[in-house]
A protein has these predicted regions:
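Alpha-helical transmembrane segments of multi-pass inner-membrane proteins
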Residues: 33-46, 57-66, 91-98, 109-123, ...
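Short aromatic-rich membrane-water interface segments that cap or initiate transmembrane helices
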Residues: 48, 101-104, 166-178, 275, ...
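Extended, hydrophobic alpha-helical segments in both membrane/secreted and soluble proteins
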Residues: 216, 306, 326-327
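Transmembrane signal-anchor hairpin modules in multi-pass inner-membrane enzymes, especially those
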Residues: 1-96, 102-140, 193-199, 228-243, ...
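TM-adjacent membrane-interface loops and short helices in multi-pass inner/ER membrane proteins
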Residues: 282-320, 334-340
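Flexible juxtamembrane loops connecting transmembrane helices in multi-pass membrane enzymes
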Residues: 168-172, 226-227, 254-287, 427-430
């Protein structure tokens, strides 16, 4: 017992010495470095800055940092090279896409969402190369604290759902896959930087446990690829031993857990890793459906355009806001040129001699995961990607004009506060306030449409939506219902068939259409209008053909996933159609 106490005392003493050195190092850092370190450390805890209103807060904070830098130094430095050009074009493209986007209102929200990416890049340019590398050390510290807190909160029933998704630890991201890749990046940093063995052992162990508890199969595969790379890339023998021992213990622990509990969910989800898993197969369906759209739209469809248009071109039963591939997402959102520029900047970094091995490995793993997920929509992950890029080369511009900088910061801040407030109102359950503040806010308008009680209100709200977005099936369905209430079956048919075009796998739309056509046939027959009654009957008889056309267009992959198309009409409707023939 005495020996244990002595051992613990020594370890605590060593830890205190380490903490003292860390404090000394931090005290020597510049204010701008400390501000960026705080953003890199804290932003993952704020939902990873996923929501637009959080991105707006980040934009205002970064504008404030730049203004303070200008005040203290009298100038701002901008290195206009490949990396900055890619970031600038990316953000600008989100803004300009409003002129041709599927939804012009939501396109502006995309600009505000990714504005912090450009501002963060400008702040990075105010640091030296050595200071940039030091920011990466913040990543494992943030992941360590997040894992400890997430595990603790997951044991509290009151808040468990906020940290656990389908028995998988999701961290403060509330998304297990992004949480897992964040921890893997932390492991890579810990294995590559100089630090005490004790801290390295504890840090990697906790981060590895977090990955296992996340149940992310993709990150597990990347982890299996990363460990051998780190093992041979690391010169320190002690680090190699730590990596090998912890990796072996992790795999053995998961296998033992699965064997003893006969449970392959949650932590043991890795045991079901296969190319035939439904979640992986359906992603290939997303990609396959999107490729023709990418070729057809070289300028992209704007922010959220893919989400609103997918109902008209998808060949399976799914509905996703993101395509789960960041390269394809860029192509869909803002087109070929920005996507190619970003890709070139990444490839240039990976093959540059001026890029450290740590940066290359972090960038490679993050990009590999981005090919199967939407990590960069969490801006905290985008910030890490920016830290790994090569910012050298190009021409350096020095901005000394306070009026230009203050004006730009004020414009960006005002736009961010305006859009961010509207988004916050919507997220917090006040869509009427969101729509009042920002009328082109389609998501808020759609919710308000579902709450309308009269045909007139329904028609008016649908018209507001269709002014900025011609691809909302619910709006056309509402106009069809309004026309039906007014007895205008010609318009009802036009709008309902457009709604079906935009949501081809929604069986309820076909059933609703049949019900309205049946009433039309009865009313026209009673009124003695045989021509109109026959027209309605012809459209009703066409419904099975419409369904058959959709089924014929359905990709074989769609039948291999969990959510299969369900387009079989109930028996009474099938009998009704047969009786009309």
């Amino acid at each position: 017992m005495l020996e244990r106490c002595i051992f613990l005392t020594r370890q605590l003493w060593k830890l205190s010495e380490v903490m003292q050195k860390i404090i000394e190092k931090i005290s020597n850092k510049s204010h701008i470095w400390l501000a960026l370190a705080g953003i890199v450390f804290l932003s993952p805890f704020i939902y990873g800055l996923y929501h637009e209103w959080l991105a707006c807060i980040a934009a205002v904070a970064l504008c404030a940092i730049l203004l303070l830098r200008l005040r203290h130094n009298g100038q701002l430095r901008i290195q206009v090279g490949v990396s900055f050009a890619a970031v600038f074009v990316l953000v600008a493209a989100y803004g300009f896409s409003a002129f041709w986007a599927t939804d012009s209102g939501m396109a502006l929200m995309g600009f505000v969402k990714f504005l912090p990416v450009m501002l963060f890049s400008v702040v990075l340019m105010q640091l030296d190369t050595d200071e940039l590398g030091g920011l990466l050390r913040v990543v494992p510290a943030s992941g360590f604290v997040m894992t400890v807190l997430s595990f603790g909160f997951s044991r509290i029933p009151l808040v468990r759902e906020a940290f656990v998704v389908d028995s998988r630890l999701a961290g403060f991201f509330q998304y297990p896959n992004t949480y897992a890749i964040f921890l893997l990046l932390g492991i890579i940093v810990l294995a590559q930087v100089e630090c005490r063995l004790f801290l390295q052992l504890i840090g990697i162990a906790v981060l590895l446990l977090g990955i296992l508890m996340s149940g992310s199969r993709t990150v597990f595969i990347l982890l299996c690829a990363t460990v051998p790379i780190l093992f041979f890339a690391t010169k320190k023998k002690s680090t190699r031993v730590v990596l090998a021992a912890l990796a072996a213990a992790g795999v053995f622990g998961v296998a033992l857990y699965a064997y003893l509990t006969q449970n392959t969910s949650g932590m043991a989800r890795f045991m079901t890793t296969s190319l035939e898993t439904s979640t992986l197969i359906v992603r290939f369906l997303y990609f396959k459906d999107a490729l023709p759209i990418i070729l057809r739209c070289p300028l992209g469809m704007g922010y959220m355009g893919y989400y609103f248009e997918q109902g008209s071109f998808k060949t399976g039963l799914y509905s996703v806001a993101h395509i789960h591939n960041e390269l394809l997402q860029l192509l869909l959102d803002i087109g070929w040129i920005p996507a190619l520029l970003v890709s070139f900047a990444i490839l240039r970094t990976l093959f540059s001699k001026n890029t450290s091995r740590l940066q290359k490995l972090l960038l490679a793993m993050l990009c590999a995961h981005c090919m199967l997920d939407f990590d960069l929509h969490f801006l905290s992950m985008f910030f890490i990607l920016l830290l790994t890029l090569n910012w050298s080369g190009g021409k350096t511009f020095v901005i000394k004009s306070k009026s230009i900088t203050v004006t730009a910061a004020a414009i960006f801040s005002c736009i961010s506060i305006y859009i961010g407030t509207a988004n916050l109102m919507y997220i917090s359950g006040h869509p009427e306030m969101a729509a009042m503040l920002y009328p082109p806010y389609t998501s808020a308008q759609i919710y308000l449409l579902t709450q309308t009680t009269t045909a007139q209100q329904m028609n008016r709200r649908a018209d507001i939506i269709l002014q900025t977005n011609q691809h909302v099936a619910l709006a056309y369905s509402a106009k069809a219902r309004s026309a039906y209430a007014a007895g205008n079956f010609e318009n009802m048919i036009k709008y309902k068939e457009r709604a079906i075009e935009l949501t081809r796998y929604a069986l309820e739309e076909y059933i609703d259409y049949i019900n309205m056509l049946q009433v039309g046939i009865e009313l026209y027959t009673e009124a003695g209008d045989s021509v109109s009654a026959e027209f309605c009957r012809a459209r009703l008889l066409e419904v099975p053909n419409m369904i058959e056309a959709v089924l014929a267009d359905t990709d074989p992959i769609a039948w291999r996933v969990a959510d299969k198309p369900q387009l079989t009409l109930p028996q009474k409707y099938a009998e009704l159609i047969n009786s009309m023939q």
